Each structure stands twice: as structure tokens, then as C-alpha cells.
Amino acid sequence: MTDNNAPGAMTFALKLLGLRSHSKDELKRKLLKKGYSAEGIEPVIEKLSRMGALDDHAFGMEVIRSRSRRKPSGRLKIVAELRKKGVAETIISELLKEYDSVALCHRAAEKKLASLREMSEADRKRKLEVFLSNRGFEWQEIQSALRLLVLPGADDDEPC
């Protein structure tokens, strides 16, 4: 379906935004995939931006807040997710200035440790390192969490 119909594109865009927030780029891609032309999409994106319904900064903040609450992740994973959704690098940098990934790493580690109680200390440490690394936390943050949770063998000099 190829459609230059801006009102149709606006209706579809509002439907998508009613489900959840989107970045400008993400919404553009979905409208293009639906079959609307680039010429029909551009005015819709501009109008939604002027109305405040489409704001990459607010969208990025919402992603970070949601991720922090639901499934704590490190900076690396947050950056990758925001890039994938089309948020500009300048906005990502600005949003991450206040991001406390060390505290989130500690919280994620504490929660995960509850499911690792039956394992040996060495296995717990290894599993926790892999888990936190997969969540996008950096090595220093992981080691800090291991030290805080008093896991023997969490040595700064040993790589993961």
C-alpha cells in the first residue's frame, strides 16, 4: 500500500503513540513500513513534534526510567537500545549524565544473587559476572558490586 495521505499517516502515528512513546526515527520507520511515503510522513512528524507528542529527549528519559525500574541495565545496553530506536547521540550523552549505573549494577546483582544461593562461591561469582556483563554493565561496575556484596575472590586485578 503506497499512500501519500497525510491524514491517514497522522491517524496511524497517533495510534502508535497511544500504545507507547516512540522516537522520531522509530515512528518514521514504522510509517514507511506501513506504506506511507516519505513526503507524507515528514509533515506528520513535524506536526507531532510541534504538539509535543513526539520528543526524543522525553522518549529517551522514559526508556531509561523504565529500564532502571524494571530491568536494570548498564550504560552500554542503554546506549545500544537508544541508538537502535534512533535517538541522536547528543541526546543520549545528555541523558546519561545523570545515569547511576553503579547503583543499578549493585541492585541487579543483589536481586540475581537470590537465585544463585545454592551454588559454590566461585560459580556464583562467575554467573553473576556473566549476568551483569550481559546487562551492559562495565567491568569496574561489576567488580564494585561483587566487592560490595562481599564475594570472596572478587579481585580487581582479574579480568572477567
Curated annotation (Swiss-Prot):
Record gene name: recX
Main location: cytoplasm
Disulfide bonds: none
Assigned keywords, A-Z: Cytoplasm
Protein name: Regulatory protein RecX
Family: Belongs to the RecX family.
Single GO BP term: regulation of DNA repair
Gene Ontology terms: cellular component: cytoplasm
Top-rank taxon, per record: Bacteria
Free-text function comment from the UniProt entry: Modulates RecA activity.
InterPro entries the record matches: RecX_HTH_1st, RecX_HTH_2nd, RecX_HTH_3rd, Regulatory_RecX, WH-like_DNA-bd_sf
Subcellular location: Cytoplasm
